[in-house]
């Protein structure tokens, strides 16, 4: 597993790089984890419906090829893209999603933030509020896209959409529990727990 810390990047640029990486990889290619933040952007998943974008204002909307509905990415949100040959690892996509949810819950528990999952609504929640989203694409047995964890960001752009297709879905973030939390530190803990699941 190769880990890349990419800083803050344009969504479309990284999406193209993920597709290119996945298209040229072979059975000997290492799996990779890309850690980054994005400039403000709304992304529609393959199941995304236009009516879930309520008021985008000046924020760009990108029609993506990941699973799921519309979400928002912006600075202060930890994005981790999982470029993994799940066929080689004998993993199903549902098992991978469940493992990613476990990793996110472990990170949150490290900070004593009580997190949970919800049946039929992938991602991680604190009470009824969503704190992390998951959206993946599988091509030729290999995944790309991944997770987004709200760390210390401006949540107001989520008000311009129905997050993940749920009307009035409230969002939360780690800084509500730890005001001085740093994304870099959270990223390190994410990698630590990720590598306990995936060598």
Curated annotation (Swiss-Prot):
PROSITE patterns associated with the record: BPL_LPL_CATALYTIC, LIPB
Active site: 164
Main subcellular location of this protein, as a coarse class: cytoplasm
Annotated localization: Cytoplasm
UniProt xrefs under Gene3D superfamilies: Bira Bifunctional Protein, Domain 2
Stated family: Belongs to the LipB family.
NCBIfam families cross-referenced by the UniProt entry: lipB, PRK14342.1
HAMAP family reported in the protein's UniProt record: LipB
Protein name: Octanoyltransferase
């Amino acid at each position: 597993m190769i880990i890349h810390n990419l800083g803050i990047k344009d969504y479309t640029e990284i999406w193209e790089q993920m597709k290119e990486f996945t298209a040229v990889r072979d059975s000997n290619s290492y799996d990779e984890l890309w850690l980054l933040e994005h400039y403000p952007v709304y992304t529609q998943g393959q199941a995304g419906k236009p009516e879930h974008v309520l008021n985008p204002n000046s924020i760009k909307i990108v029609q993506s090829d990941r699973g799921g509905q519309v979400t928002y990415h912006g600075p202060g949100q930890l994005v981790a893209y999982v470029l993994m040959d799940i066929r080689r690892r004998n993993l199903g996509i549902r098992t991978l999603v469940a493992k990613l949810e476990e990793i996110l819950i472990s990170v949150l528990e490290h900070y004593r933030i009580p997190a949970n999952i919800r049946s039929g609504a992938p991602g991680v929640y604190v009470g009824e509020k969503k704190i992390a989203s998951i959206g993946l694409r599988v091509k030729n047995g290999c995944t790309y896209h991944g997770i987004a964890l709200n760390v210390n960001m401006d949540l107001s752009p989520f008000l311009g959409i129905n997050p993940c297709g749920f009307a009035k879905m409230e969002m939360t973030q780690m800084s509500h529990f730890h005001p001085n939390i740093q994304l870099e530190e959270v990223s390190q803990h994410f990698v630590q727990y990720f590598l306990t699941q995936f060598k």
